[in-house]
């Protein structure tokens, strides 16, 4: 009987130890799950911060290319070129290709024919990372980096502007803006942004690729992050190249 009681006691102790082991495993798993949940937002934030940094660097590279273009041709590129009938042909993004290490691609483009002509099909298929925000996954070749165009902007349709003509100051005048994906265009396309599109971005803040605003390239080559709720008067002043507008703090 003593041996039987001992066997039962040992069996009870074994089950107790097994039960404690499972409790320990479950506690450890619970801690691991909690840690994963706690660190996931931090990981996402770190990834988005890295993507925002790369987006900013893309625009800085574009700004440097615009100024290198100006150094060579003594004027900034037009927003787009036109044919003899005034039909848009090629974007400023195509014109600055030699200044973003894409000389060979530039040479393969027939500038006398439209950007979407079959003669330019090979270039059309080319994806250029410098024209793509890492926070966006657009269709191949699409870009959310659009020039600000209009009658009094720096990049004007079919007309080149010299730096001295930017009388409002290159540090207070927009060159390129980052729009939300629904306004994306092919990088070869002559389509760009205007004041109306910019003013409408505040109503589309939930679809912006960066929380709270968007990047802009100023004509001095600097990149700023504009708050989506920026005052309309400031935005209008930033668009103007020679309107003697007071931009103020932003």
Regions from the PLM with identified roles:
Residues 16-47, 51:
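N-terminal single-pass transmembrane signal-anchor helix
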Residues 37-39, 48-250:
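Surface-exposed loop/linker segments characteristic of extracytoplasmic
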